[in-house]
């Protein structure tokens, strides 16, 4: 995501209509969690609205531990997190991915680690995934933070590779057909570069870039770079915060 003088990501979420209760899943670019001053109490109020949140730009585990501690002390739920096994990025900048979630909502949680590239440099930050089970709904959740780069060409190349990410995790657990891909893609989801991901896997994006912007700059809503890709046949509702 291109940053201006002041920039944050809007948190996007989906709610799955399950029996006997719904679960809400969100994606959030935390803007260097652990490396700068954060109002963790305010952040926890936002995060606590959801059951499972995929986090990008986690700089270290210290920030996650602090967020978890505040959530546990200010909500009625017990919270836990998974952090990616390695930091990803360039030699000058690296970050972790993480999931933070309400323990009572999930009976099974397992890290599937970072995507293993077929060819070197498919992604500047290889996506990270985990498998979750909530009541009768089990799924793989993949989170991503695409390159911004010096030109749009870099972003297009990465976007065209997300079909391979989907296939990688699908092949890793062949019996799992519920796979969610979310994050900060630095391109709108209706870009042609995402067509292979959408068409080959019967997916749709939940935020229409034509109507909704998801990135805030010092000048207001700037672009629609954050999104969630999900099976077209799933029942869900969408919200922006």
Give residue spans per PLM region:
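Acidic/histidine-rich helix-loop elements
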Residues: 27-38, 117-120, 149-154
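Loop/turn elements at helix/coil->beta-strand transitions in domains of secreted/extracellular proteins
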Residues: 21-24, 48-52, 76-80, 105-107, ...
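Active-site-proximal beta-strand elements of phosphoester/diester hydrolases
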Residues: 22-32, 110-112, 138-148
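Active-site beta-strand/loop signature of hydrolases that rely on acidic residues for catalysis
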Residues: 23-30, 46-67, 100, 141, ...
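Active-site neighborhood of phospho(di)ester-bond hydrolases with catalytic His/Asp-centered motifs
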Residues: 54-55, 82-85, 179-184, 205-210
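Metal-dependent phosphoester-hydrolase catalytic domains
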Residues: 61, 167-177, 187-241
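Structured beta-strand-rich core segments of catalytic domains in phosphoester-bond hydrolases
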Residues: 59-137
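Sec-dependent N-terminal signal peptides
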Residues: 4-16
């Amino acid at each position: 995501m291109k940053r201006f003088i002041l920039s944050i990501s809007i948190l996007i979420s989906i709610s799955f209509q399950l029996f006997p209760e719904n679960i809400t899943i969100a994606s959030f670019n935390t803007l260097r969690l652990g490396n700068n001053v954060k109002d963790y109490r305010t952040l926890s109020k936002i995060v606590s609205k959801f059951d499972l949140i995929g986090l990008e730009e986690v700089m270290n585990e210290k920030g996650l531990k602090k967020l978890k501690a505040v959530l546990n002390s200010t909500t009625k739920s017990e919270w836990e997190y998974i952090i990616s096994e390695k930091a990803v990025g360039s030699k000058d900048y690296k970050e972790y991915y993480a999931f933070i979630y309400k323990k009572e909502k999930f009976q099974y949680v397992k890290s599937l680690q970072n995507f293993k590239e077929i060819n070197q440099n498919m992604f500047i930050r290889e996506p990270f995934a985990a498998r979750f089970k909530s009541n009768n709904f089990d799924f793989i959740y993949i989170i991503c933070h695409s390159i911004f780069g010096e030109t749009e060409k870099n972003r297009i190349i990465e976007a065209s590779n997300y079909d391979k990410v989907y296939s990688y995790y699908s092949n890793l657990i062949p019996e799992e057909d519920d796979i969610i891909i979310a994050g900060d893609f630095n391109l709108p989801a209706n870009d042609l570069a995402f067509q292979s991901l959408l068409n080959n896997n019967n997916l749709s994006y939940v935020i229409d870039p034509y109507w909704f912007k998801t990135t805030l700059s010092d000048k207001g809503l700037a672009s629609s770079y954050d999104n969630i890709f999900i099976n077209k046949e799933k029942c869900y509702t969408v919200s922006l915060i």
